[in-house]
């Protein structure tokens, strides 16, 4: 059955593991990274840092995940049971700017690692390089060899490579052109180090699916090929799409190739993959009654969790504690003890019951919609009153202050 790992969201990327039997109905089953390393660094909210474009692979009875951290290097973890405990992260190659790593175990026993570079950290980008790994896959043992240069202007911002081998060809699936408006590029060569031919195999075309790229090729047990990729939708995150993939003259064609030029457009409706059986409709969890001893997998903290942020119970509620804000506090951009989940849809309603027990003046609790621009509804203790407020912050990453207005108040003794 297919497994899928991704860097979830902008901040705390614990490597969620999703499982499916048919590539359509997915269940969130685990997190491969209970704590993000280095721990001291990620105890604070770190936007745009940590796990970038992980790849999950199965080899010799074990599941592997490789990813690039643009500030620390390329990491690897592994397990025999993806729903169980994963190994501690191994730093395969230390350095700045290395991102989007994917391994390949070749028939001759050699192990290769392809990755890209983030210009914001390394000063170079739009290139793909391949290094050799040791047999255990735990250490890079050769210098990087550049196999593709997108700085000629035709395929700028090439990144996110996935490496495969089929019919004697090495294939590199890589997005180019930028996250929001790019396209899906495929390279092929008979030699791991090239030279590689290149071809654009999927573009937005006449659809409303912008930037259809950066994903992985999956084969079903019935011989079908499919491509899972994302579409960037701004504040709503990176929405996942599934497109059919066919092979023509040893080139993949992704989506609907209406004019038969070898380059497809993403489909909006299509028949489900044929996997030999039917699976029930499944969606990731959203609602939570907070009546179990484990926090629902849909929830993530804004940074590495500390025990004193809150406690689960069997009693139908989650007990949260207020944290102390630093003297330099401007807004919630770097505050770690926010408990959040991704938007379930573009439009939705959230309902909750909150009991507020304030021990000190200035304590607050409430509901927040968090992002570069954010807004929240807090209840704050202010002297002898509880105040319901609305707070809005624009461009929080630029350390802009919140704009707060009072909506209602009630005397403490009234309660």
Give a label for each model feature:
Residues 243, 250-252, 257-415:
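Extracellular glycan-recognition regions
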Residues 13-16, 73-76, 122-130, 180-187, ...:
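Structural motif
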Residues 1-8, 12:
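Single conserved hydrophobic/aromatic residue that forms the stacking wall/gate
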